[in-house]
């Protein structure tokens, strides 16, 4: 009798990233990646986050002691250029948007741009059932002429209904993010409760300018969410830390 070999399993986060990529590829989005070790410019300055914003505090961000400075070519307005060179573990995947657009503009390739960015991010915060020092985030970007909130709404509804099922309800609420204006939180009705699942909005003109795009000619939308949180909702996994403790009893269920 032949030995029956145990088959391997994809980690639920890896499976979710494959599914998310497939959904957005249906809409014509490309997949983009970028460095996890960033400069303060790309992680904060280029995204219109003030240099005195609390998100930059030591208790929220992992700063790198050595090297003390990274590579940064810009100094905009009242921003301190030396500060902008400081290296940091990226706190979100939004810096990839700036790098992607900047690179395309350098090559003379003008919009439209449609990308999604799944990747690992880092936050200097206490861990509990819903918070981890590292987790996976999804970022999305679409830049073209006359991009509107209607494009944003249609894209996110398509994504969430494909990922969770066509029966879900979705609503948009006004909110604030430094890099979008106007901004909206996206809630999903899941098992009878409204839950916040995404942040989104039309790209702030300052962010377009920082990437080399003329905000008078082009507009765009951006959105972001935690992939771990989406997987927790979809699978019923109650604790984000379970994704990272290496317990095969979790992975083997998928």
Language model features with spans:
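TRNA-recognition modules of translation machinery and tRNA-sensing kinases, especially anticodon-binding
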Residues: 2-254
């Amino acid at each position: 009798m032949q030995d029956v070999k145990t088959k391997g399993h994809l980690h639920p986060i890896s499976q979710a990233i494959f599914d998310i990529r497939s959904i957005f590829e249906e809409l014509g989005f490309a997949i983009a990646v970028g460095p996890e070790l960033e400069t303060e410019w790309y992680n904060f300055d280029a995204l219109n986050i003030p240099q005195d914003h609390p998100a930059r505090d030591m208790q929220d961000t992992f700063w790198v002691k050595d090297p003390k400075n990274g590579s940064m070519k810009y100094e905009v307005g009242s921003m301190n250029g030396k500060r902008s060179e400081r290296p940091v573990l990226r706190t979100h995947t939004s810096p990839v948007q700036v790098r992607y657009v900047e690179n395309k503009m350098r090559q003379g390739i003008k919009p439209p741009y449609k990308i999604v960015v799944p990747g690992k991010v880092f936050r200097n915060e206490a861990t509990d059932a819903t918070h981890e020092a590292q987790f996976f985030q999804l970022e999305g970007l679409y830049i073209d002429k006359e991009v509107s909130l209607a494009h944003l709404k249609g894209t996110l509804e398509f994504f969430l209904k494909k990922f969770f099922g066509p029966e879900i309800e979705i609503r948009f609420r006004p909110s604030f993010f430094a890099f979008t204006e106007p901004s909206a939180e996206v809630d999903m009705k899941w098992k009878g409760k409204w839950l916040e699942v995404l942040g989104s909005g039309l790209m702030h003109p300052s962010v377009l300018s920082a990437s080399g795009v003329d905000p008078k000619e082009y507009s765009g939308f951006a959105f972001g969410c935690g992939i771990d949180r989406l997987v927790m909702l979809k699978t019923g996994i109650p604790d984000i830390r379970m994704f990272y403790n290496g317990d095969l009893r979790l992975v083997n269920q998928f």
